[in-house]
Every structure is written in structure tokens, then in C-alpha cells.
């Protein structure tokens, strides 16, 4: 259940995916809507920090954590060493178990899902970056 000031639909706007839920207002209220272009300009782009793979590796050596938001089956095929797997669709439920003092570098195959994951984490006060180019830009994809 959503409360006053809560938001929904960010994942679809960020990753260019279809909405994954319908929301029904249970009582009278006002719904504010922000179009996709305005959302990207005002909220998404300023909140996202993109890092190159090599820089991400340096950050992980200093204590950052790779956070892979792909499906478990995708993660099992290949993933970055010591990566944590929380599928994007579980992010809101599972992020309460994450250490807020850690820097998370969110990754997926292309960067689309990871940008949604990093946005959700940033919105909740986490230090989150997105792996630029996704796993396709890593040594794993080059093999």
C-alpha cells in the first residue's frame, strides 16, 4: 500500500519497460503525474552516477559492492566476482537488508535495469552508481 508522497512507475520510465503493476486509489485524493521527458530531465538524470567498468573495479577494491539486478537464471550464467544478486522486481522488498553505509554499483546486461535499480536505491538514500554499458562492457562479455 502506498502512502502520501510515495511514488510508483519509476522502473518503467527509466528502463523503457511496460508497467508491472496497476494502482487503484482506495480513497479520495490527488494524483500528480510527471511525463517521461520531464521525469528524465528533472529526476532521473541528475540522480544517476555512471561509472566505467575499470573505475567500478577500483571502487569495489575499496569496499563498494557489485549489485546485479538481473534474474537469478541470468546471474547463474555469469556475474562479476563477489556480486550480490537482487532482481530488480525484488529491489523494494530486499533493500531494507542492504548496508546503507556501502556504495553499490548496480549492474545488468545493458544498463537499463541497473539504472532503474540505482534510481530506487538513490531515492531511498543509498549511495548507488550504475555500471556504464552494463555487463556488456566488462571482461566477462569480452570472453
Where do the protein language model's features map onto the residues?
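Rhodanese-like catalytic fold shared by cysteine-dependent sulfurtransferases
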Residues: 4-7, 11-22, 26-55, 62, ...
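Structural scaffold elements adjacent to functional motifs in cytosolic proteins
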Residues: 66-68
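Short, surface-exposed ligand- or partner-binding patches at beta-edge/loop junctions that are enriched
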Residues: 107-108
Amino acid at each position: 500500500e502506498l502512502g502520501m508522497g510515495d511514488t510508483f512507475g519509476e522502473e518503467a520510465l527509466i528502463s523503457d519497460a511496460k508497467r508491472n503493476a496497476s494502482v487503484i486509489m482506495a480513497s479520495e485524493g490527488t494524483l500528480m503525474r510527471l511525463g517521461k521527458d520531464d521525469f528524465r530531465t528533472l529526476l532521473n538524470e541528475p540522480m544517476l552516477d555512471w561509472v566505467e567498468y575499470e573505475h567500478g573495479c577500483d571502487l569495489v577494491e575499496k569496499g563498494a559492492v557489485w549489485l546485479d539486478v538481473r534474474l537469478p537464471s541470468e546471474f547463474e550464467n555469469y556475474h562479476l566476482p563477489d556480486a550480490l544478486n537482487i532482481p530488480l522486481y525484488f529491489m523494494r522488498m530486499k533493500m531494507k537488508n542492504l548496508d546503507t553505509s556501502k556504495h553499490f554499483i548496480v549492474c545488468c546486461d545493458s544498463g537499463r535495469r541497473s539504472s532503474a535499480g540505482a534510481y530506487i536505491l538513490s531515492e531511498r538514500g543509498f549511495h548507488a552508481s550504475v555500471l556504464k554499458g552494463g555487463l556488456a562492457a566488462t571482461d566477462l562479455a569480452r570472453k
